[in-house]
Design a protein with these regions (language model features):
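A glycine-rich beta-to-alpha transition motif near the start of alpha/beta enzyme domains, typified by
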Residues: 1-113, 165-279
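Active-site glycine-rich loop that binds ribose-phosphate moieties when present
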Residues: 124-153
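Intrinsically disordered, low-complexity regions enriched in acidic/Ser/Thr/Pro/Gln residues
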Residues: 116-118
Length: 279
């Protein structure tokens, strides 16, 4: 059977996008995501994002995210910008789009020429919202976490999916393929966790790398960038209410923390190619 797809990327966080609005999500989507995401052997991507018919009144579409290991994610910040760009170029040319996710309805606004701003909603540092266990009941800001025998200072943030953020001196020197799995599968995070390693350049500029649950190190993570800015704001490193520019391996995202812990994310979305593949 031939399957039509669009490959898109936001800050090099690349996914295979499927139009499932009429057909629904394929029954074998987990296996399909594993197969098609394999770099060098297939299309290659961080996973598959299905663009589905909306399930919520007022939504233009719904997105479902499947990681490279077949597991389903709740939200993808880079992915939602690409969904907006796909809809915009495939017949829903609205300047403001409402996209449903497993983390709720998100508003995405066109900023011109492939640039989109996403209202990501409010973040939380409370253990129950991640979830996290054995870390106390108060906000998970500047906590101690021992990973594979090494002690880290971490701040844990939920932005609809869970993140563990740690500030480091030199992010480029880290061997994430050795460090990341210990965070992802730590017993304190029963649903696994995404981990961000951030280097502070100055009060409005950060440099970050990410280890995503289910995908390993990726070149960017929109929700992870939001969680990182939320964390350093909680720590008093960066100011709320100002644009914070985060350099990722794949590009730059701009995040702002608004009153009520609301987050705004601005970044690009680009179509890489379109095609069909045998499945």
């Amino acid at each position: 059977m031939k399957l039509s797809f669009t490959k898109m990327q936001g800050c090099a966080n690349d996914y295979i996008y499927l139009d499932c609005r009429a057909s629904g999500v394929p029954e074998n989507i987990a296996a399909l995501s594993e197969k098609l995401s394999r770099r060098h052997f297939s299309i290659g991507a961080d996973g598959i994002i299905c663009i589905c018919a909306p399930r919520t009144a007022g939504a233009d579409a719904m997105m479902r995210i499947f990681n490279a290991d077949g597991s389903e994610g709740k939200m993808c910040g880079n992915g939602i910008r690409c969904v907006a760009e796909w809809l915009y170029t495939h017949g829903i040319a609205k300047e403001t789009l409402a996209i449903d996710t497993l983390s709720g309805l998100k508003t995405v606004t066109h900023q011109g020429a492939g640039l989109w701003q996403v209202e990501m909603g409010a973040y939380s540092a409370m253990p129950a919202d991640l979830p996290a266990v054995n870390m106390g009941e108060d906000a998970l800001v500047n906590k101690v976490l021992t990973v594979d025998g090494k002690v880290w200072q971490v701040t844990c943030i939920s932005v609809g999916n869970p993140h563990c953020v740690t500030v480091v001196e030199d992010v480029d020197s880290l061997k994430l393929e050795q460090i990341g799995p210990g965070f992802e599968h730590h017993a304190n995070f029963p649903e696994r966790i995404n981990t961000e390693f951030v280097q502070v350049v100055d009060a409005t500029h950060l440099k970050m790398r990410v280890w995503e649950r289910g995908s390993g190190e990726t070149w960017a993570c929109g929700t992870g960038t939001c969680a990182t800015v939320a964390a350093v704001t909680e720590l008093g490193i960066c100011p709320a209410g100002e644009d914070i520019h985060v350099q990722l391996r794949g590009g730059v995202l701009t995040i702002r923390v608004l009153p009520g812990k609301q987050l705004l994310m601005t970044g690009a979305a680009e179509t890489v190619c379109e095609g069909t593949t045998e499945v």
